Amino acid sequence: AQADLAHAEESLSGELQPRLFYALEQLLVTPAISPFMLVKIPEEPEYLQWLANETRTLHQPAATLCGVHYQVDGGKISLTPAHTAEDNFASVAPVEAADWIEAEQLFGCVRQFNGEITLQPGLVHRANGGVLILSLRALLAQPLLWMRLKNMVARQRFDWLSFDESRPLPVSIPSMPLSLKVILVGERESLADFQEMEPELSAQAIYSEYEDNLQIADADTLKQWCQWVWQNAQQLELPGLSANAWPLLIQEGARYTGDQETLPLCVLWIARQLREAAAFCEGEEIRAEEIQTMLERRLWREGYLAERIQDEILQEQLLIETVGECVGQFYALSVIEFPGHPRAFGEPSRISCVVHIGDGEF
């Protein structure tokens, strides 16, 4: 079984995220329904990098080089179509991703020093002819950037504009053709805010989601999840799990999802378990003893508040009777979640029955 995990397919993403991959194919392979795509996915660098890597596997670069070559001659700037990848505004990386952007990073800039003018490309130039993946959080915080980007994608033309309205560009710069597909990623709240700001575009854009969990229906599905964890360990350059360590990780995954038949596909959760367990690993694989040590240390590290509740019971500041019997009184376990605390814990509560005369109304 361990050998099967090590010799898994290059990528399981297509099998574990079929809806998302179908949406990517609609955007990239088939005639585009819309140049924009919305994806519900955590706005973290690890997820954006994963999405960029999977998009590269589906994206087919154009037969001809995209972009132009800007020639600066004193105060005059001209452009010609790009002939080599070394041209200053030729597109060499068809898929670009960023979780936060500034105007200069997205659209490039014009620099002038000692009378010499230079043009610096931005993300839209490097992704010309391909795909640009951006975080909705960054665009919602800077609506002017979004309006300019949307306009350029719709018109298929990049216009050089000054970021400071009080200081125009020192020279006139010819516009360049732009062929770009944009994937906007965000959590549910960001998508809702974007839909309110752009209702028509949201209705026309291709939509899909990253599925956080995997329903374990049979042994094959469980094997796929184990292969997914193994591939994440290889990408992070961390040791894999030994055969006796898998039950503990599966149990912790079920505890995380709250369902014994559901396991997480969250790359951040998987990376955290592997990194913390690797700190105790002394061999080539992470063993069950090292997983258990990691979980016990984490419980102790995060268990201050839970221990204080236990101390109150032991010191009889919180009276919890565990012997004898009493009519109309019983105990329940309340789940306590403190803001900012990573772990929920249980607190016993006494519930007493109170009887009183009613007021005669239903």
Describe each PLM feature range.
Residues 1-201, 206-218, 226-243, 247-289, ...:
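Conserved ASCE/P-loop NTPase catalytic core
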